[in-house]
Structures are given as C-alpha cells and as structure tokens.
C-alpha cells in the first residue's frame, strides 16, 4: 500500500522520521519497548495538542511496559496525519510522559548544566541557577532563555512533578531544579535576565491621561481590532507605551496610529 503525501504534510512527516528511526535504534539497543509517538501524542487538525486524549493514550500504553523508548517532538491526528511541536518540542513530549506515568521527577538531559542567570554570549561566565519556580521559568523561556521549551512545564506542573535540567556531557553537575515554589533563599535578588528581539514600541502622551477613565482600554481596543497582540504596556501619569511584535505591526502601522490619534 502506498500513501501519497503532498506539500507541507509530507515535509512535516519527513522531519519526524529521523527521530522515529533514532527511537527504533535506541529501543533495540537497550532492549526496551518502542512506542511510536504518533500512536500516543494526539493533535487536532489545526496542529494543537489534545492534552486529555494524549494523557489517556500514554497512560494506557505505558501501563503495559516496564521500560519504553518514545521519540520526541511529534505526534499525529486521529487519522494518522503527523504533526509536530515547535522547535524544542521533545521537552514537551518528555513532560507529557512524566505526567502520564506519575513520575517522581522529570529529568531533562541536554547539552548545558541547567539555566544560567543571564546569556553567556553577552555576559562572561554567568552564575548557574540552582532552583527556579515554574512561573519564573515560564517568563525566562518566553523571553529568550532556550534551555527548555516554554510549554514543557504545563503537564508536570499540574501534577506537582519537579523538572531537573541536566547536562549529558557533565552528568556530575546538579543542573537546575524547577519546582512549584521554593523556601530556599535565593543567591541573587534577581533570578535571571533574558531578552527577546523583534518588538517595536508605540509611545502615547496625553495630558491628564491618568484621570480619563477607559483610556487604556480604548487604545488596546485599536490593536485588537487590527488583530495585533500586545506584549507589555508600561504607563505613567501622562504617558503610555505599548510593545507589540514588529512583524504584526508593520503592515498595519499607519491605520493603527490613525485610530489611536483620533479624538475620543
């Protein structure tokens, strides 16, 4: 039987085959069961993870195995169409598996010894972060810290499963422990610093802005009407700045600014 795949569907499936074959080889080498991620990681047609269905499939499948190898970063729709997570999606796969088997801890082995206080490409020899909360990690991951996929915390967080980021090349390092909360006094006042490119700022100034009820809502409504998501909105007494993604704003800049400048 030959199945013909065309366009992006073929590209997505092709991208997953290396991981699939690597999993097959690893399972054979270790003598473990091989579980194809396409059979247990469920996506909808739009490429969104179906978390509840995935958890059911994983729990049922893994309850029959003492040891198993599961390829990362891809899954499939109910009809077998292969879908993938975004870059680094194997972290999410590991988190989903940890939740399904009610693991005591999710060890994520990578090529660095956990998170650092700041980017080593900018700051020389930054200090490692020994422990960090899920919330702090979520902020750092979204703003550019790429050690762990930003969505990997959700499955394990609900179950209270800690994550330990470890270094494959330096297994003796303790890495970074990610938990719901920590009573340990941090070494530094600031947990970490990360940055993300590709934003632009719209600065708005108006006298007595702070006393005008609904002004901020009216401004943000303009962006919503144009289909532009905002990232951050710092404000002062007479000033307001809206940070948006540059690629979303460029084609709609003039129309957005016209609506913002219109008297209300």
List the model feature ranges, each with a label:
Residues 1-7, 12, 258-264:
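Single conserved hydrophobic/aromatic residue that forms the stacking wall/gate
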Residues 2-3, 84, 90-93, 110, ...:
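Ser/Thr-centric signal marking residues that sit
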Residues 7-9, 13-153:
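Nucleotide/pyrophosphate-binding catalytic subdomain
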Residues 35-37, 71-72, 109, 150, ...:
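Generic beta-strand/beta-sheet core signal
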Residues 140-178, 193-208:
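A conserved active-site cap/scaffold subdomain adjacent to cofactor or substrate pockets
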Residues 174-261:
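A conserved regulatory-domain signal marking ACT and ACT-like small-molecule sensing domains
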């Amino acid at each position: 039987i030959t199945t013909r795949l065309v366009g992006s569907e073929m590209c997505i499936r092709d991208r997953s085959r290396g991981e699939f074959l690597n999993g097959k080889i690893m399972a054979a080498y270790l003598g473990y069961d091989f579980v194809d991620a396409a059979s247990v990681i469920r996506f909808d047609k739009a490429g969104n993870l179906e978390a509840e269905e995935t958890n059911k499939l994983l729990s049922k499948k893994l309850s029959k195995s003492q040891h198993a190898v599961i390829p990362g970063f891809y899954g499939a729709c109910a009809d077998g169409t292969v879908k993938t997570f975004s870059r680094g999606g194997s972290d999410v796969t590991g988190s989903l598996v940890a939740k399904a088997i009610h693991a005591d801890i999710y060890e994520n082995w990578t090529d660095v010894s956990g998170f650092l206080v700041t980017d080593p490409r900018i700051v020389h020899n930054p200090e490692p972060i020994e422990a960090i909360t899920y919330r702090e990690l979520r902020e750092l991951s979204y703003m550019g810290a790429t050690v762990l996929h930003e969505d990997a915390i959700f499955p394990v967080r609900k179950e209270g499963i800690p994550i330990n980021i470890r270094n494959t090349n330096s297994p003796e390092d303790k890495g970074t422990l990610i938990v719901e909360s920590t009573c340990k006094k941090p070494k530094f006042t600031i947990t970490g610093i990360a940055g993300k490119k590709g934003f632009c700022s719209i600065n708005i100034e108006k006298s007595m802005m702070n006393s005008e009820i609904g002004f901020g809502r009216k401004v943000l409504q303009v962006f919503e009407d144009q289909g532009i998501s905002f990232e951050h909105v710092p404000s002062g007494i007479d000033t307001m700045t809206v940070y948006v993604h540059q690629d979303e704003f460029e084609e709609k800049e003039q129309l957005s600014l016209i609506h913002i400048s219109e008297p209300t």
